[in-house]
């Protein structure tokens, strides 16, 4: 287990690598969050590509993509087939990909699709407590895409899911937990206002893809995602304590986020 100092150094290293290399993140994501997702990737220093067509996704992956995001938020059968194709090509090219199983357990099509995708070697799985519990095979109660369980409730399921899939699992909530099934890192950055803006959680999936493109391990990428997004959320609320302006300030905060901010603000919970 890394010390807090080592974790902070790793997070700042990932931030620096994103800004230095500007990885291309191919996002097969939901229609509700595409603008925020694309702008968030640009703000942190990555390059977004938003596609839904299978043929074009394969072309993009072959052109130098750093990571792939698969987000099931508004999935259709056609898009689901494109996701399967993109995932197979990403695996063939050894490109890391992230699964964001939005509202899995609440709706049948995406639950079936997520069950298939989790067996195809995602590097990171990001979800709220209910989504992670459902994907791991546990019963959970949701309100659409929103979780009614705490992230701590899902920690056991997250560890099992990580061991089963080989992915790092990031459970987001008041406390964010990142695990590879053996190690667990808990981070306590963020603000409740983040849950009042549509797309912030889904955009964390995109950020985790950017981190996966540069980080030495999926677990470290998950930790970096939680810390960077959480700190940006805190900074955004200090500037804009209402939902509409908060969304804009979140992008500004990610753009302005410095290594010094990470050193000063990162909070890790002892387990």
UniProtKB/Swiss-Prot annotation:
Enzyme class (EC, first level): transferase
Residues involved in ATP binding: 126, 172
CDD domains: THZ_kinase
Domain of life: Bacteria
Gene Ontology molecular-function annotations: ATP binding; hydroxyethylthiazole kinase activity; magnesium ion binding
Enzymatic reactions: 5-(2-hydroxyethyl)-4-methylthiazole + ATP = 4-methyl-5-(2-phosphooxyethyl)-thiazole + ADP + H(+)
Presence of keyword Transferase: yes
UniProt-listed Gene3D superfamilies: 3.40.1190.20
InterPro entries noted in UniProt: Hyethyz_kinase (IPR000417), Ribokinase-like (IPR029056)
Any GO BP: thiamine biosynthetic process
Cofactor(s), by name: Mg(2+)
Binding site for substrate: 50, 199
EC number(s) recorded for this UniProt protein: 2.7.1.50
The protein's annotated pathway: Cofactor biosynthesis; thiamine diphosphate biosynthesis; 4-methyl-5-(2-phosphoethyl)-thiazole from 5-(2-hydroxyethyl)-4-methylthiazole: step 1/1
Keywords from the UniProt entry: ATP-binding, Kinase, Magnesium, Metal-binding, Nucleotide-binding, Thiamine biosynthesis, Transferase
Recorded family membership: Belongs to the Thz kinase family.
Role: Catalyzes the phosphorylation of the hydroxyl group of 4-methyl-5-beta-hydroxyethylthiazole (THZ).
HAMAP family from the UniProt entry: Thz_kinase
Protein name: Hydroxyethylthiazole kinase
Organism for this UniProt entry: Akkermansia muciniphila (strain ATCC BAA-835 / DSM 22959 / JCM 33894 / BCRC 81048 / CCUG 64013 / CIP 107961 / Muc)
Lineage: Bacteria, Pseudomonadati, Verrucomicrobiota, Verrucomicrobiia, Verrucomicrobiales
């Amino acid at each position: 287990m890394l010390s807090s100092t080592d974790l902070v150094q790793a997070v700042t290293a990932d931030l620096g690598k994103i800004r230095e290399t500007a990885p291309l993140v191919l996002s097969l994501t939901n229609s509700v969050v595409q603008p925020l997702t694309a702008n968030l990737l640009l703000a942190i220093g990555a390059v977004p590509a938003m596609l839904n067509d299978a043929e074009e996704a394969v072309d993009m992956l072959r052109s130098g993509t750093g990571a792939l995001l698969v987000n099931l938020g508004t999935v259709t059968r056609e898009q689901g087939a494109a996701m399967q194709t993109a995932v197979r090509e990403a695996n063939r090219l050894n490109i890391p990909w992230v699964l964001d199983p939005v509202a899995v357990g609440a709706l049948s099509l995406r639950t079936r699709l997520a069950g298939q995708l989790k067996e195809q070697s995602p590097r990171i799985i990001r979800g709220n407590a209910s989504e992670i519990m459902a994907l791991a095979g546990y019963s959970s109660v949701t309100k659409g895409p929103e979780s009614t369980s705490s992230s701590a409730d899902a920690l056991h399921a997250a560890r099992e899911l990580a061991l089963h899939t080989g992915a790092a699992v990031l459970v987001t909530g008041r406390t964010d937990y990142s695990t590879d099934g053996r190690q667990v890192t808990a981070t306590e950055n963020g603000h409740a206002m983040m849950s009042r803006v549509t797309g912030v959680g889904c955009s964390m999936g995109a950020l985790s893809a950017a981190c996966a493109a540069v980080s030495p391990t999926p677990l470290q990428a998950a930790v970096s995602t939680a810390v960077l997004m959480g700190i940006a959320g805190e900074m955004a609320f200090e500037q804009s304590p209402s939902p509409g302006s908060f969304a804009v300030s979140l992008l500004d905060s990610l753009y302005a986020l410095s290594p010094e901010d990470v050193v000063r603000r990162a909070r890790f919970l002892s387990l």
